[in-house]
């Protein structure tokens, strides 16, 4: 990653040039999308009036690479956040204040035409800075605190199958008082089943445990495009909400006739439809209409992004925002890092299942700490140095610090009950926040992950010899970039919003 930014004396970003060179290994995999993501999502956090992006992915004789948590964003976010820290230091501005002066705002377009709706980046910054007392941090030797922010999409705006079919579909059936929701979305551990059950139950006045789910079975459930790009809560959740609202309208209509009132006077909740138990209303409706079945679908709105080459990567119906502060100590004699605490604030839109949301945040934090402190794909003479999980170092409970999770609800206008993603976003700011904290502790920059003791000691040695106190790449790969297209930026607030 290579980045150059033009900044005014007051800290306002004027222009940015971002270059990416990815080592893709032996095969193509998601190479084009991964490459474009490294440039597309930098603009969802900061206002960048003029932006130039160049990206290339090369084939090498290594294991093939593919997408993982935060697809295409951890590496460029690490580069950009440390880059902004260096700018803040150079112009004598607090790193948090520098970012605040450049944050995107709700209901705008980025320079690459991405649509921003709800945006809690300022709120998550305020909450995490206040909770960690970042502004009052101590300056004792070897102790450091680092800050970083990021954002992530709530599902890809374009489908993986090039057709005009819905991105997600749900069918809701009520028979003899029992409720079954059918959806093709697959719960791979992220808790999407609880989201679908909670959304349907909330609309029907039931408990989530009252909803029977049939998911991930293409023989019974309608199509959902899959569990990727943090899309299931937003897209399948909206489909479930539509199906449940249609079922609610049927039951409320029957209950209103039975009660002799208008549908608007019928209250739904606590297992009741007006004065009737849910089962009673369901039986009455089934006597009249037969088996009750409704469906719901979700298709992202049009015009989420631009029409230039590569614009299909990055658009999303919404974006979540995260901010992290890391507190640590570094031994200047050995470079060993002791993590003390991590604060992470996440703009969730609305938390549908707070326990699951907090679990996702903590999982993202721990995964980010593993990536920044110990995990690496290292090769020597063409051979992988960690060919098994026995050799590949990952964090355990012994290395992990206390994590304070702060949820910020901004109520996205298009999410189900205002909800947004949480599966991937919280990982992203943790990695640069650790490197920033190391610099705060010792005054050296480690511009390469993982940030290991030997790299810290080499940076300290460079500083002692009168150098810049930095460890990282010295030269950018000499690669040929594709011819660039010049694209006019959109209006700041188009009428489409």
Language model features with spans:
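Short acidic, glycine/serine/threonine-rich loops at helix termini
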Residues: 1, 17-19, 25-32, 59-60, ...
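Short, solvent-exposed aromatic-acidic interface loops
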Residues: 18-27, 186-188, 342-349, 409
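Active-site cavity-forming subdomains of large catalytic enzyme subunits
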Residues: 1-51
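C-terminal catalytic domains of large/alpha subunits in multi-subunit enzymes
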Residues: 9, 34-152, 199-497
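Conserved beta-alpha junction segments in alpha/beta enzyme cores
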Residues: 22, 36, 40, 148-178, ...
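Short, small/polar residue-rich loop motifs at catalytic or cofactor-binding pockets
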Residues: 1, 166-168, 322-324
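Immediate post-signal peptide segment of exported/extracytoplasmic ligand-binding proteins
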Residues: 12-17, 140-143, 175-180
């Amino acid at each position: 990653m290579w980045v150059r930014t033009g900044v005014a004396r007051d800290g306002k970003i004027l222009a940015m040039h971002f270059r990416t060179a990815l080592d893709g290994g032996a095969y193509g995999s998601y190479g084009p999308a991964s490459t474009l993501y490294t440039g597309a999502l930098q603009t969802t956090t900061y206002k960048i009036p003029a932006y130039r992006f160049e990206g290339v992915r090369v084939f090498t004789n290594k294991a093939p690479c593919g997408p993982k948590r935060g697809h295409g964003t951890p590496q460029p976010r690490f580069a950009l956040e440390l880059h902004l820290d260096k700018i803040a230091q150079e112009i004598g501005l607090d790193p948090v204040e520098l970012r605040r002066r450049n944050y995107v705002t709700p209901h705008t377009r980025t320079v690459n035409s991405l649509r921003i709706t709800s945006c809690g980046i300022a709120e998550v910054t305020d909450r995490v800075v206040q909770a960690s007392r970042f502004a009052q941090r101590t300056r004792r030797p070897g102790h450091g605190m680092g800050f970083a922010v990021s954002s992530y999409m709530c599902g890809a705006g374009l489908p993986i199958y090039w057709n005009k079919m819905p991105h997600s579909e749900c069918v809701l059936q009520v028979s003899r008082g029992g409720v079954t929701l059918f959806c093709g979305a697959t719960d791979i551990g992220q808790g999407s089943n609880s989201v679908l059950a909670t959304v349907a139950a909330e609309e029907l006045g039931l408990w989530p445990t009252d909803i029977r789910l049939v998911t991930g079975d293409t023989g019974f459930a309608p199509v959902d495009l899959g569990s990727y790009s943090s899309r299931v809560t937003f897209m399948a959740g909206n489909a479930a909400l539509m199906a449940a609202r249609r079922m609610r309208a049927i039951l409320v209509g029957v209950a209103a006739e039975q009660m002799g009132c208008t549908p608007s006077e019928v209250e739904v909740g606590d297992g009741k439809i007006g004065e009737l138990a849910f089962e009673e209303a369901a039986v009455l409706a089934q006597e009249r209409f037969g088996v009750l079945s409704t469906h719901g679908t979700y298709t992202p709105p049009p015009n989420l992004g631009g029409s230039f080459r590569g614009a299909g990567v990055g658009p999303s119906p919404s974006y979540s925002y995260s901010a992290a502060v890391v507190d640590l100590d570094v031994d200047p004699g050995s470079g060993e890092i002791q993590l003390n605490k991590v604060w992470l604030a996440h703009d969730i839109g609305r938390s549908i299942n707070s326990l699951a949301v907090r679990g996702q945040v903590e999982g993202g934090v721990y995964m980010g700490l593993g990536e920044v402190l110990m995990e690496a794909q290292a090769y020597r003479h063409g051979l992988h140095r960690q060919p098994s999980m026995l050799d590949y170092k990952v964090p355990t409970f012994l290395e992990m610090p206390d994590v304070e999770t702060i949820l910020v609800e901004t109520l996205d206008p298009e999410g189900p009950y205002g909800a947004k993603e949480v599966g991937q976003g919280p990982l992203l700011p943790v990695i640069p926040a650790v490197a920033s904290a190391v610099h705060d502790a010792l005054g050296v920059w480690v511009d390469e992950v993982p940030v290991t003791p030997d790299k810290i000691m080499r940076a300290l040695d460079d500083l002692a010899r009168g150098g810049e106190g930095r460890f990282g790449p010295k030269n950018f790969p000499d690669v040929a970039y594709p011819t660039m297209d010049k694209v006019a930026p959109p209006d700041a607030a188009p009428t489409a919003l």
